[in-house]
Amino acid sequence: MNHIEKWLKSTPTFDCGNKSIEEKAKDITKGYEEASDKARSLFYFVRDEIKFIPHLPVGVLESYQASKILKARGGMCIQKAILLATLARAVGIPALVHFVDIRNHRVPTKIKEVLGTNLFPYHGYNELYIDGKWVKAAPTFELKVCQDNRLIPVEFDGKHDALLPSHDLGGNPHIEYLQDHGRYENIPLDKIHDAWTQAYGLEARRGLNQFIEVRKAKSRHLRR
């Protein structure tokens, strides 16, 4: 197996051989022949149809399994990146998750208060191998989140890098890229959770997850 082919294989998290993943990937890319067009269509599906939920899953493998993320229709940056990489692999595009620490200067005040910081270790974005080169893409925030918060949405054409922007629509600082952790063939759960514990502490992580669950419950109640 060469250095490109290994980013096509199915793993416990990148379960691209799962029936639901295969069917969804084929449905999204139906009618497209070029890898860049397929990648673009998959990107926008994950960006906008998979809701960004800023929770911090404790080390349960299923929380990071692409087929489970697809079924849940929501997840944090790492989970959305896992799903995009897996859908891409399902249609023959080598893809991976790249990890980096970021500082989000536009993080909601309540979340910053709970965590005690705007630092987010091990943010995950994608790299996809298209037309002989690796292209970066971050499907983190859906369009509605960007519109509601005056953020610049990430737009991806399947050919050029598309990462989270440094400033928002008002010119205020948004994302600051810090330490690069690189690529991993398997999701480094131990390193991720150690970094989260060091940055936030266990109580803050539990507090954030409880806060998100309350918000989700309120949202379900309003939809009734």
Predicted regions and their residues:
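Secondary-structure boundary elements
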Residues: 2-72
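His-Asp-centered catalytic microenvironments across diverse enzyme cores
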Residues: 2-3, 9-13, 102-224
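Short capping/connector residues at structural and topological boundaries
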Residues: 19, 57, 74-75, 159-161, ...
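A sequence-composition feature that detects small, non-aromatic residues
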Residues: 25, 35, 39, 66, ...
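Residue-level signal for well-ordered alpha-helical scaffold segments within enzymatic catalytic domains
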Residues: 44-48, 86, 90, 124, ...
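Active-site neighborhood of thiol-dependent amide/isopeptide-bond enzymes
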Residues: 54-122
